[in-house]
Swiss-Prot record:
SMART domains: PGAM (SM00855). Pathway: Carbohydrate degradation; glycolysis; pyruvate from D-glyceraldehyde 3-phosphate: step 3/5. Homodimer. Pfam families: His_Phos_1 (PF00300). The keyword Isomerase applies. The lineage of its organism: Bacteria, Pseudomonadati, Pseudomonadota, Alphaproteobacteria, Hyphomicrobiales. The keyword Ribonucleoprotein does not apply. HAMAP family: PGAM_GpmA (MF_01039). Its EC number is 5.4.2.11. The gene is gpmA. Catalyzes the interconversion of 2-phosphoglycerate and 3-phosphoglycerate. InterPro entries: His_Pase_superF_clade-1, His_PPase_superfam, PG/BPGM_mutase_AS, Phosphogly_mut1. Belongs to the phosphoglycerate mutase family. BPG-dependent PGAM subfamily. This is 2,3-bisphosphoglycerate-dependent phosphoglycerate mutase. It comes from Bradyrhizobium diazoefficiens (strain JCM 10833 / BCRC 13528 / IAM 13628 / NBRC 14792 / USDA 110).
Length: 207
């Protein structure tokens, strides 16, 4: 029986995470801490005895750099990798590049909270979580999931909100449930799937 392995990891801390800025499709790189988080993710996966056949990531530097560092720790630098904007972070539109405290001053605490935490209300010029799922989910179903079900050990390095789309399907969460799910930077989540694509086991490598 082939192993149906899927590992998800959010990119390590970025320069804009550190500065408390809305990032979205803007393209800052990792901080020193983010680099360390990505390397630690690779070491944790190696300690689990994992190797991969294929990887998927976004077109944004912070996710690609995270993937590269993980693969370096695994000794798998040449791993076939698909890069697709379907896995990009949620586009925060007019909020992109703004300090979160400054955004609260401009639009008010309640409005910014609605944009950040509601399922289907987008910020001006940007995407809601529902919009993000609408592009990430088809990519998962059409590209990533068939790879896993065909026995390819699959690693996905992406972003908090695009990974929420995958987790929503994997764990059968409601919109309310996925909104409450926080994903730490640089922490791998290991799923093993049944033949019908349901989750057989899950291991979160936090800590």
């Amino acid at each position: 029986m082939s192993e149906r392995l899927l590992v998800l990891v959010r990119h390590g801390q970025s320069e804009w995470n550190l500065k408390n800025l809305f990032t979205g499709w803007k393209d800052p790189d990792l901080t020193e801490q983010g680099v360390a988080e990505a390397r630690e993710a690779g070491r944790k996966l190696k300690a689990q005895g994992l190797v991969f056949d294929v990887a998927y990531t976004s077109v944004l530097t912070r996710a690609q750099h995270t993937l590269d560092l993980i693969l370096g720790e695994l000794g798998q630098k040449g791993l076939p990798t698909e890069k697709n904007l379907a896995l990009n972070e949620r586009d925060y539109g007019d909020l992109s590049g703004l300090n979160k405290d400054d955004a609260r001053k401009k639009w008010g605490e309640d409005q910014v909270l609605i944009w950040r935490r509601s399922y289907d209300v987008p910020p001006p010029g940007g995407e809601s979580l529902k919009d993000t799922l609408a592009r990430a989910l088809p990519y998962y179903v059409q590209e990533i999931l068939p790879s896993v079900l065909n026995g390819k050990r699959t690693l996905v390095a992406a972003h908090g909100n695009s990974l929420r789309a995958l987790i929503m399907v994997l764990e059968k969460l409601s919109p309310e449930g996925i909104l409450k799910r926080e994903l730490a930077t640089g922490v791998p989540i290991i799923y093993r799937l049944n033949a019908d694509s349901t989750v057989a086991s899950k291991l979160d490598l936090a800590g």
